[in-house]
Amino acid sequence: MADLAAGVAERGPRLSLWSSLDQRLVWVVAATALLGLVMVASASISMAEQATGDPFYFFKRQIFFALLGLGMALALLQIPLATWERAGPGLLLGALALLVLVLIPGVGREVNGAVRWIPLGVFNLQVAEVVKVLLALYLAGFLVRRQQQLRTSMAAFLVPVLVSAACAFLLLLQPDFGTALMLMALAVGLLYLAGAPLWRFAALVGVLAAAAAALVVYSPYRWQRVTAFMDPWSDPFNTGFQLTQSLIAIGRGDWLGVGLGGSVQKLFYLPEAHTDFVFSVLAEELGWLGVLAVVLLFSYIVWRAMAVGWQCHRHRLPFAGYLAWAVGLALGLQAFINMGVATGLLPTKGLTLPLFSYGGSSALATGAMVGLLLRCGYELAQARAEGRRPEEAAS
């Protein structure tokens, strides 16, 4: 008993889960989500009234989705990260199974020529959103298991690349080029942060860039999007319609915006105003100051994720470190791509803006990533409470 008591004392006190949460991160995420709800209500009001007779139909559903996302975050917050680390290979198989399942006729639902959703009654599950989370968990576990070989073995370097490429290939069959590109970028980013040799990293980036270019050039649909991106005003009522309407919305907003609810572009001019282009409506109604606020909110979330990841590695919590980095990269990449598309910096991709865009799948996936990030922060705080010193100090 004395030895047991001594061991407990040596490990330090067990922290309360709720009292040790990253309070600033929680408040920033909550503020971002609340602003997102307001913008969904504003951007969808006309479409909802025309489609259902209830101007707040999409807003009410988004509140439900936000609560689902909150529930997902709270549930994952309770689960030790070691559970996910052990389950990595199974999670990967689950991701691949979902990607195959959605392609089976009669299972996946086709919308606008793409088969990306599995009907679940309450909402349609977009498989890519789930795969994004499962792949992040698998990659984090793999990098922990092969951390040393990653710097010396080409096989260890190629496994995460090939796994991500397999997921990307199945996504291209849906087709979902934007998410496929994002998953490959996530894998590349994690390999770089894990310390992969620079020449391998550079070679991989070159190969992926060439592959992406080939997919664009040899696909008339994607090439049309690129040409529309390069000069949207040459065909503003056809191929360049989405981008020109988005740019008009952003231009109308100027510095202070036209006021909440005052957007004209959401009145059936701007397609997907409450989903893919909710950022454009925000820019029109809240102006560049609103845009700056959103950019700062996302910048803080990403910065915090990367900082937590770095501290986890210093305190010898490698799985938590890689997972926090994966969450930061995933949220940051998706937000950057969505904003880049809306402002004309990138070709149209069809990716949602986390915490803003309407949709149950996006809310669940974002909630899962936030819950996992908060769990990483909790286990870091627990390691500090147990007296575990950073590597520099320990040496």
From Swiss-Prot:
Ranges per topology, Periplasmic: 46-62, 108-116, 174-178, 222-276, 338-352
Pfam families found in the cross-reference section: FTSW_RODA_SPOVE
Pathway the protein acts in: Cell wall biogenesis; peptidoglycan biosynthesis
Any GO BP annotation: FtsZ-dependent cytokinesis
EC number: 2.4.99.28
Cellular localization per UniProt: Cell inner membrane
Reaction(s) catalysed (UniProt annotation): [GlcNAc-(1->4)-Mur2Ac(oyl-L-Ala-gamma-D-Glu-L-Lys-D-Ala-D-Ala)](n)-di-trans,octa-cis-undecaprenyl diphosphate + beta-D-GlcNAc-(1->4)-Mur2Ac(oyl-L-Ala-gamma-D-Glu-L-Lys-D-Ala-D-Ala)-di-trans,octa-cis-undecaprenyl diphosphate = [GlcNAc-(1->4)-Mur2Ac(oyl-L-Ala-gamma-D-Glu-L-Lys-D-Ala-D-Ala)](n+1)-di-trans,octa-cis-undecaprenyl diphosphate + di-trans,octa-cis-undecaprenyl diphosphate + H(+)
Keyword Disulfide bond: no
Sequence similarity: Belongs to the SEDS family. FtsW subfamily.
Name under which the protein is recorded: Probable peptidoglycan glycosyltransferase FtsW
